[in-house]
């Protein structure tokens, strides 16, 4: 029992730390009256290259950040709990992969936010659970489908709000597999 609680807490530590960083960045950005959107991705332009690494850290406002907080925490926690041996590698691959693909084939304009990371995590958890045919991971696949199945519609421009970058969401769908 004690080991289970430790494992749960350990899996939560990295997502909580990331979310803490996201909120601290947003608080500093707002408090200092800065606009950090230039740290996002601007496809196929030199000024947007750094955004491949930083785009998930920058959000347009607290509502954008708040909308990403719970899915980012839950999906990251699932990754670090159920895939602890490969979680770090998968997380980094999804982070960089979403940024790189958005940089290469995204629409002109700044792309910011952790939504691409969230979509990549959701698709990895879904497909990895199904492909491994291991009952606990299949259960996670079904839970991810139940909680976040509707996100698939935001991958297409027709169903996405006008200010949402659907490009990054589409490119992370075929997430990296181990």
Summary of predicted features, one role per range:
Residues 1-7:
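Short, Lys/Arg-rich, polar N-terminal cytosolic tail immediately upstream
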Residues 11-90, 103-111, 162-164:
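N-terminal TM1-TM2 helical hairpin plus the immediately adjacent luminal interfacial "cap"
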Residues 23-26, 96-104, 143-154:
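Aromatic-anchored segments of alpha-helical transmembrane domains
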Residues 53, 64, 116, 146, ...:
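Divalent metal-coordination and catalytic microenvironments
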Residues 66, 70, 114-122, 167:
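Membrane-embedded alpha-helical segments of multi-pass membrane proteins
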Residues 76, 80, 123-128:
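Hydrophobic transmembrane alpha-helices
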Residues 137, 161-170:
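Loop-to-transmembrane alpha-helix initiation sites
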Residues 171-178:
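Conserved small/polar residues in nucleotide/adenosyl-binding loops
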């Amino acid at each position: 029992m004690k080991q289970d609680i430790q494992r749960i807490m350990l899996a939560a530590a990295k997502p909580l730390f990331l979310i803490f960083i996201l909120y601290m960045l947003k608080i500093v950005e707002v408090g200092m009256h800065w606009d950090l959107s230039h740290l996002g991705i601007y496809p196929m332009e030199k000024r947007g290259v750094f955004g491949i690494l930083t785009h998930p850290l920058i959000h347009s406002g607290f509502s954008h950040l708040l909308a990403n907080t719970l899915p980012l925490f839950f999906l990251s926690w699932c990754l670090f709990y159920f895939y602890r041996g490969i979680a770090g590698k998968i997380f980094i691959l999804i982070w960089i992969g979403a940024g790189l693909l958005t940089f290469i084939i995204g629409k002109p304009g700044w792309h910011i936010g952790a939504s691409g990371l969230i979509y990549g995590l959701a698709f990895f958890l879904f497909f990895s659970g199904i492909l491994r045919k291991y009952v606990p991971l299949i259960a996670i696949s079904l839970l991810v489908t139940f909680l976040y199945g509707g996100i698939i519609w935001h991958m297409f421009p027709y169903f996405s709000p006008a200010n949402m970058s659907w490009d990054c969401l589409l490119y992370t769908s075929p997430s990296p597999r181990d």
